[in-house]
Curated annotation (Swiss-Prot):
GO terms for biological process: negative regulation of transcription by RNA polymerase II; positive regulation of DNA-templated transcription; signal transduction. It comes from Canis lupus familiaris. A lipid is attached at residue 61 (S-(15-deoxy-Delta12,14-prostaglandin J2-9-yl)cysteine). Residues 905-918 have a biased composition (Polar residues). GO terms for cellular component: cytoplasm; nucleus. The lineage of its organism: Eukaryota, Metazoa, Chordata, Craniata, Vertebrata. The modification N6-acetyllysine is found at residues 431, 440. PROSITE patterns: ANK_REP_REGION, ANK_REPEAT, REL_1, REL_2. The modification S-nitrosocysteine is found at residue 61. GO terms for molecular function: DNA-binding transcription factor activity; transcription cis-regulatory region binding. Residues 425-473, 894-926 are annotated as: Disordered. This is Nuclear factor NF-kappa-B p105 subunit. Gene3D superfamilies: Ankyrin repeat-containing domain, Death Domain, Fas, Immunoglobulins, Rel homology domain (RHD), DNA-binding domain. ANK repeats lie at residues 539-568, 578-607, 611-640, 647-676, 681-711, 715-744, 768-798. The keyword Phosphoprotein applies.
């Protein structure tokens, strides 16, 4: 046979096989499709593999499956099934099929094969004597319940040993000597039974019930006709249970967004086919022109996977955040265990919009040129002559009336100037007040006067033709002449009225100019134009908006003063096209003085921008603690403290997301609800701090804000669930020390509801939820949740060696203590403690008779360095204290001449210049370590107790303050 020759030709290239070893059946080294021949003898080959996915394992109570296990090439109209062939042999034979595991080492599986020719979980089929191809058309897989895995596996192993069905490979290597016997089943010794029991016990713990493989073994007859000659077995591809999360085909069904900013961090809701929450990734990738691949992964935790069908994640940062045009990439699901991926979907990264509030764009707008105010010749037919020149051109786009030139801002105007109608009754939302349409009263009064175009039109109408003169009656001529006379008179009246008003306006402005020349006070000029402050430009900005955008604080103050009592309430709260009030812009542009001026002038604190943000939200987002402090003093601030924006976030949530410790402390002190839930998923500020892995803010919320440590989201998730799912040992330790319960169940089922079949008819109640212990991703977190003390990565000796505070002399320390005891709040020990990250201990320091000394002692034993101390003093502007430290290092060298030269030599203290510090460094100093908790974990500060010398971080609160009963004191 030609096809047999192919296999025979391969024999010379194959090594001679010893008895089966685990290495041969390592799935990474062994390909099931390849025949495993013996030297010049018969061997078994798989002709068609079973279909890997789409076949469901069924429980006993579900009944038999509909149709057998299909083959890999099976189609809807062309069914196929697994097939094997005994090569190089013709005659009677027996083929058995067993279910084995998919691990690195092959073992018997607890599931059973059912169907035709199947008994006790094993399928036995005879082959030959002519056709050596064997098909398995009716195979089904019976899913064993979790409770019966050990019992079933032990029985299956016992049968394999008694019948000699590969016991050395599938049960234990020590049982390899057991072979098939012609006389029937053999009896097992007690030692063999114990080996089987221990093997079953061990393999039960490691068995994956969602995947199996078929192992085919052929037996040929011996001289007595008994089937004892075993050929080397072959193993199929893995077969995955279709209802198992890690077996289904990955598929993205829907995303609520398909584009995002290059900076990442944008939240996307993704619907998908069944996934396993701890075995799934969201991969973004781009194939580069040079053949390389960029990839990034969405940020989410197991708590963000809802019922295996939805994932809420944040986009990763793109490789280049400075792109100028959109970049197209792909997004796909990827399973961690086998790296299988879904079909990729397109995703677009667009350039960062750095000026979302459009402040920079408006600042870059061309400034008006002073020379544009001179020469009315640019108007529609206007001549020259200067501002009050006699150029006789008519009023056009560049002039007012017969010759007054004013800069044009694009308003609907008389000659470029806009008069706001009814300024004493103006609407704060009104834009572009115009008077280019005559009112109803004007059109009906004064003898039914009409405009100049009407006069010109009527003038044309009243010129009769010769034919009209001949045919017209005398009465018509009189009437027509009378009408024309009336209209001409009205036209002259309107012209005179307009000129009179224009002259009055000019006199007012001239008098204001004289007053300004005498006093030098610009308010003299602004006072006569205060009614125009309600006019808005093409962006909806008033003069007050523009003055704030261009950082003219004094002009803002002048405008507020001249409009006081007239239309101030309308103008000061007027919104532009972005729904920004002047107060919003003052916060965005970080102008503390302007914010204060606007509030004093009556600005409304409660107005929201287009995204629903109040000024409290904006100040917290920008990390402007000084502005936030001003705002919180307002009487309406209390009503806005817990008001959500369009994203459902309160100001305290935004302060946490912006990593602003000063803003968080201000909000907590002002009475903000630290347990308030954001509107999307019910997360509190503590949840957000844990999500951002910010131990400093989490500690502040617990210690300063008395946050409820076991607060839950809409799906019952606590902060400890998030910390455990993300594998954060430090946050898990902090929350556990604060009394968090590791046994709280959320609403996510611990196992798939479809697994209710496993109960085999037994009612075991509802499916339990998932606890933090269930979600622990590493052993460190698991041990902490079980009460094991937190162990840092470094020992105390290593960390203490980093400090050099001992180099300071006692005299220098005494001088520092004295300087830090002054009452100045900007230069005392309390401010220094905040800068050094020990601010959380200030209340304890105050109990000490010498707070400054206690602070410095704590800083020294926590491994503090002189460099950090000097930098903190530099931020405070405390030059006297810095000079004390410098003198302490210079004095010894000045007294002792350098050997060999005899000249004094000064030590250069490694002080970092404030000018070289980046804003990021300042944020880190002021925010990350400000609560003291971060310092405790980072330095393992073995602080001597202020009263008894106990450990440095002890969370001592009443049980009810953490929402727990019983003792909750924890030490880290």
């Amino acid at each position: 046979m030609a096809e047999d020759d192919t296999y025979l030709g391969a024999h010379e290239q194959m090594f001679h096989l010893d008895p089966l070893t685990h290495t041969i059946f390592n799935p990474e080294l062994f390909q099931p499709e390849m025949p495993l021949p013996t030297a010049d003898g018969p061997y078994l080959q798989i002709l068609e593999q079973p279909k890997q996915r789409g076949f469901r394992f069924r429980y006993v109570c579900e009944g038999p499956s509909h149709g057998g296990l299909p083959g890999a090439s099976s189609e809807k109209n062309k069914k196929s099934y697994p097939q094997v062939k005994i090569c190089n042999y013709v005659g009677p034979a027996k083929v058995i099929v067993q279910l084995v595991t998919n691990g690195k080492n092959i073992h018997l599986h607890a599931h059973s094969l059912v169907g035709k020719h199947c008994e006790d979980g094993i399928c036995t089929v005879t082959a030959g004597p002519k056709d050596m191809v064997v098909g398995f058309a009716n195979l089904g897989i019976l899913h064993v319940t979790k409770k019966k895995v050990f019992e079933t596996l032990e029985a299956r192993m016992t049968e394999a040993c008694t019948k000699g069905y590969n016991p050395g490979l599938l049960v234990h290597p020590d049982l390899a000597y057991l072979q098939a016997e012609g006389g029937g089943d053999r009896q097992l010794t007690d030692r063999e039974k114990e080996i089987i029991r221990q093997a079953a016990l061990q393999q039960t713990k490691e068995m994956d019930l969602s995947v199996v493989r078929l192992m085919f073994t052929a037996f040929l007859p011996d001289s007595t006709g008994s089937f004892t000659r075993r050929l080397e077995p072959v193993v199929s591809d893995a077969i995955y249970d279709s209802k198992a999360p890690n077996a289904s085909n990955l598929k993205i069904v829907r995303m609520d967004r398909t584009a995002g900013c290059v900076t990442g961090g944008e939240e996307i809701y993704l619907l998908c086919d069944k996934v396993q929450k701890d075995d799934i990734q969201i991969r973004f990738y781009e194939e580069e022109e040079n053949g390389g691949i960029w990839e990034g992964f969405g940020d989410f935790s197991p708590t963000d996977v809802h019922r295996q069908f939805a994932i809420v994640f944040k986009t990763p940062k793109y490789k280049d955040v400075n792109i100028t045009k959109p970049a197209s990439v792909f997004v796909q699901l990827r399973r961690k265990s086998d790296l299988e991926t879904s079909e990729p979907k397109p995703f677009l990264y667009y350039p960062e919009i750095k000026d979302k509030e459009e402040v920079q764009r408006k600042r870059q707008k061309l400034m008006p040129n002073f020379s544009d105010s001179f020469g009315g010749g640019s108007g529609a037919g206007a001549g020259g002559g200067g501002m009050f020149g006699s150029g006789g051109g008519g009023g056009g786009a560049g002039s007012t009336g017969p010759g007054y030139g004013f800069p044009h801002y694009g308003f609907p105007t008389y000659g470029g100037i806009t008069f706001h109608p009814g300024t004493t009754k103006s609407n704060a939302g009104m834009k572009h007040g115009t008077i280019d349409t005559p009112s109803k009263n004007d059109s009906e009064g004064c003898g039914k006067n009409v405009d100049r175009e009407a006069v010109n039109l009527s003038g044309k109408v009243t010129e009769p033709t010769e034919q009209d003169k001949e045919s017209s009656m005398g009465v018509d001529e009189v009437t027509l002449t009378y009408t024309v006379g009336i209209k001409e008179e009205n036209s002259r009246f309107q012209d005179n009225l307009f000129l009179e008003k224009a002259m009055q306006l000019a006199k007012r402005h001239a008098n204001a100019l004289f007053d300004y020349a005498v006093t030098g006070d610009v308010k003299m000029l602004l006072a006569v134009q205060r009614h125009l402050t309600a006019v808005q430009d093409e962006n909806g900005d008033s003069v007050l908006h523009l003055a704030i955008i261009h950082l003219h604080a004094q002009l803002v103050r002048d405008l507020l003063e001249v409009t006081s009592g007239l239309i101030s309430d309308d103008i000061i709260n007027m919104r532009n096209d972005l729904y920004q009030t002047p107060l919003h812009l003052a916060v965005i542009t970080k102008q503390e003085a302007v914010v204060d001026d606007l509030l004093r002038a009556g600005a409304d604190l409660s107005l929201l921008d287009r995204l629903g943000n109040s000024v409290l939200h904006l100040a917290a987002k920008e990390g402007q603690d000084k502005i936030l402090s001003i705002l919180l003093k307002h009487k309406k601030a209390a009503l806005l403290m817990d008001h959500p924006n369009g994203e459902g976030l309160n100001a305290i949530h935004i302060a946490v997301m912006s990593n602003s410790m000063p803003c968080l402390l201000l909000l907590v002190a002002a009475g903000a609800d630290v347990n308030a839930q954001e509107r999307k998923s019910g997360r509190t500020a503590l949840h957000l701090a844990v999500e951002h892995d910010n131990i400093s803010l989490a500690g502040c919320l617990l210690l300063e804000g008395d946050a409820h440590v076991d607060s839950t989201t809409y799906d019952g998730t606590t902060p400890l669930h998030i910390a455990a799912g993300r594998g954060s040992t430090r946050l898990a330790a902090l929350l556990k020390a604060a009394g968090a319960d590791p046994l709280v169940e959320n609403f996510e089922p611990l196992y798939d509801l479809d697994d209710s079949w496993e109960k085999d008819g037994e009612d075991e109640g509802v499916v339990p939820g998932t606890t933090p212990l269930d979600m622990a991703t590493n052993w460190q977190v698991f041990d902490i949740l079980n009460g094991k003390p937190y162990e840092p990565e470094f020992t105390s000796d290593d960390l203490l060696a980093q400090g050099d505070m001992k180099q300071l002399t006692e005299d220098a320390k005494l001088q520092l203590y004295k300087l830090l005891e002054i009452p100045d709040p900007d230069k005392n020990w309390a401010t220094l403690a905040q800068k050094l990250g020990l601010g959380i201990l200030n209340n304890a320091f105050r109990l000490s008779p010498a707070p400054s000394k206690t602070l410095m002692d704590n800083y020294e034993v926590s491994g503090g360095t002189i460099k950090e101390l000097v930098e903190a003093l530099r931020q405070m502007g405390y030059t006297e204290a810095i000079e004390v430290i410098q003198a302490a290092f210079c004095a010894p060298e000045t007294a002792a001449p350098s050997p060999g030269k005899g000249a004094p030599q000064t030590l250069s203290l490694p002080l970092s210049s404030a000018s070289t510090r980046s804003p990021v460094d300042e944020v880190r100093d002021d925010s990350i370590c400000d609560s003291g908790v971060e310092t405790s974990f980072r330095k393992l500060s073995f602080t001597e107790s202020l009263t008894s010398g106990s450990s440095l971080l002890t969370l001592n609160k009443a049980p009810h303050e953490y929402g727990q009963e019983g003792p909750i004191e924890g030490k880290i």
